[in-house]
Amino acid sequence: MKRKNIALIPAAGIGVRFGADKPKQYVEIGSKTVLEHVLGIFERHEAVDLTVVVVSPEDTFADKVQTAFPQVRVWKNGGQTRAETVRNGVAKLLETGLAAETDNILVHDAARCCLPSEALARLIEQAGNAAEGGILAVPVADTLKRAESGQISATVDRSGLWQAQTPQLFQAGLLHRALAAENLGGITDEASAVEKLGVRPLLIQGDARNLKLTQPQDAYIVRLLLNAV
């Protein structure tokens, strides 16, 4: 039986570093919010069967998203951290029968709204049938420095280093087990949780355009990228 590909967007964060008067996923770039741009990517992709957004129980912006994308599931069961939000989303997918344990969950940052469709297709094609799952990533290009008290303490060898992106694709059952720990401290992405089980996910070539909206100046670059699409 064909595995379903389910996009899961954790959107319960408040984006403190971005400095806006609302969570950054609800900041407007052009005529749409960042989150609406993200949802459009997955809704347009023929290989994605379902898209789910998990927001905070206190979210007051999600109704607009639901109106714009009535076919998207918007769940207000987000947690205090990204890992908790993803865990809650995966658990509900399994509990409701919307996902089987072998279905693929593609977890994607709500602030990465420039994901090229070809990068998404590449991830699904190369990792969609892999038991260990896989993530989009790009080789580290810049020279890395280790700091101590505001000074360089060492230059880090960047050979073999990759910068993780999203989506990160894993079977629902594996992801559920990986996030089942009571203490999720130190889990910064889904791959790091899966790695703790001894699993080594695949690295799939990502795309430099798939940047994450983090600082206010990132909005300028994102706007240019979206206009170029």
Curated annotation (Swiss-Prot):
Catalysed reactions, as listed in the record: 2-C-methyl-D-erythritol 4-phosphate + CTP + H(+) = 4-CDP-2-C-methyl-D-erythritol + diphosphate
Pathway info: Isoprenoid biosynthesis; isopentenyl diphosphate biosynthesis via DXP pathway; isopentenyl diphosphate from 1-deoxy-D-xylulose 5-phosphate: step 2/6
Keywords on record: Isoprene biosynthesis, Nucleotidyltransferase, Transferase
Residues the record marks as site: Transition state stabilizer: 17, 24
HAMAP family in the record: IspD
Family affiliation: Belongs to the IspD/TarI cytidylyltransferase family. IspD subfamily.
Protein name as it appears in the record: 2-C-methyl-D-erythritol 4-phosphate cytidylyltransferase
Organism in which the protein naturally occurs: Neisseria gonorrhoeae (strain ATCC 700825 / FA 1090)
